[in-house]
Amino acid sequence: SLFNSTSAEGCIAIMGPNSRELLQSLTDTDLSNENLPFASVCDLEIGMATVRAHRITYVGELGWELYFPIEFSNYIAELIESTGKQFSLKLCGMHSVDSCRIEKAYRHFGHDITDEDHVLDAGLGFVVKLDKNPSKYGTFIGYDAVKKRQFSGCKKRVMQFLLTNPDVMLYHNEPILKNGEIIGYLSSGAYGHTLGGAVGLGYIDCLSNETEED
């Protein structure tokens, strides 16, 4: 059965090059890459709380998302903040996260991908396993559509852009031009502080029969 646990759980994300060292100082569980590889999940004891740690990131750096009963939110936040001082921990908001994820070309559902975009057009074919053995319920929903697009070619594709002029800003929905002709529009834009210029993601039209690998 399914139930809505939105109001029952809190979440804090610890991300960055020092995230493992910081989190390891709060728990006895081995957080090495060998023990907890990318996309793994485990329960951790942090102080007086048990958290569910997801080894995942949305900023292009090492990171974890910690989920816990909502009543432990303040306790865990204060514990992480006090411990994080020795690791130069800083709080960041969504604009910071957005800048980092666009530099890494991570797609955002609602901007770069929607339920109307094809997984291959979005450059996410690597997460679709067409050679996976079917379960007792058959293949996944959309299997036939993916196979068809794989052979017919992509209609559009996501590309990443970096402006060479550091004084110009990108937001989203700016036209993408080639030789004076509009060939697409940006779906996301921000300033890339690591790259030193505005960065964006956007769809451009594909040539006939162009595949995801072309």
Residue ranges and their predicted role:
Residues 1-214:
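Conserved, structured C-terminal
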